[in-house]
Amino acid sequence: MNKSVIFFIITFLMSGSALAEKIRFSTSATNPPFESFDDHNQLSGFDIDLAKALCKRMQAECTFTNQAFDSLIPALKFRKSDAVISSLDITPERSKQVTFSDPYYENSASVVAKKGLYSTFDDFRGKRIGVENGSTHQKFLQDKHPEIKTVAYDSYLSAFTDLKNGRTEGVFGDTVAVHEYLKTNPQLGTAIRKVTDTDYFGTGLGIAVNRDNPALILKINKALWEIKHDGTYNKIIDKWVPEQDIKN
């Protein structure tokens, strides 16, 4: 092959790679099965696979950064990331700060505690419930149930450790996430099931981007629609959130 032709092909391929959009995702890998570190210390989970599928559809180069949950939106606003995917509830309060994608998962919240002791929020009066710091679960308890002692943690893992050791009486979080811990903690059960107050838990989970980046949110929404219609989304759901895991 002519050397000039080879040079042209290489240049074309390199320019295509250089022109590929780069999207920096941030997440807080403390919330399996949505996001956590696997046995090889790699980010994995429903949100991670979803973001990768969206990037593939958008033909974008995507990277992921792990950070504390309560720093995700501030970091996005200061342009340290381009998008946040971390099981974020789409709420009116958050929507004042960022732009959300279309919902990608219908979410609810549940309280986990030792079996047989609690069944209503009133049962937890004067008791301690662990939440992730900066979460909608924290705000819900503080606003709606000040009679309950809200204890904030940097991760669900820390919250469940204290619950198992008797330092708290419950953990309040995403239904799917708290059910993940029940698999390996048979002494625990669901005390309060599937709270769906839309003022706090919104209309589902969404991907957050800067309010001044409408082009990116349009691309994400288009890619999300496409993977929901070509079967990719259902495969990710079946892998990470089997329906039988959240029925009870």
Pin down the residues of each PLM region.
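Extracytoplasmic small-molecule ligand-binding "clamshell" domains
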Residues: 21-87, 230, 243
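Short loop->beta-strand "edge-of-pocket" segments that line small-molecule binding or catalytic clefts
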Residues: 23-29, 121-135, 149
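Periplasmic-binding protein-like
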Residues: 29, 105-112, 175, 179-222, ...
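Short helix-initiation/N-cap motifs at beta->coil->alpha
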Residues: 31, 48, 63-74, 116, ...
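Extended ligand-binding regions for polar small-molecule ligands
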Residues: 48-57, 117, 123, 127-128, ...
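Acidic, polar ligand-binding/catalytic clefts
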Residues: 52, 56, 61-123, 187-200
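Alpha-to-beta junction loops
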Residues: 59-61, 77-86, 128, 146, ...
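Ligand-binding clefts/hinges and TM-proximal coupling segments of bilobed small-molecule sensing domains
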Residues: 139-153, 189-195, 222-248
